[in-house]
Amino acid sequence: MGKKLKQKIKEKEDTQKLLAEVTQKDIFHCHDGQVLRSMKDLSNALSMMADETYACHWNTQKKDLSNWVRNIIGDIKLAMELEGATSRSLAAWEVATRMAYLDRQIP
């Protein structure tokens, strides 16, 4: 197997890991009761959650969602975008944009 093919396979596997569900011990419990198991769950939750709920998980001291994305899902790029997402709608857009990009990487 060629070096390029091996790299392409690894990139696909890495992308699939970012989009996969996390283990039971790593799920994220939102203030409003929603349970997040994947980036897709995060996207759906952000589209439905109240701005007040988002504020419980994101402020100048707390960045719960970006920490979960970085440390559990493993997506450093998205985590950095979420750190700067001062509103729920911006966070929802960042997650949807990242998911669309990752989906295109899987043939």
Segments (PLM) and residue ranges:
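Terminal, compositionally biased segments used for targeting/anchoring and flexible tails
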Residues: G2-P107
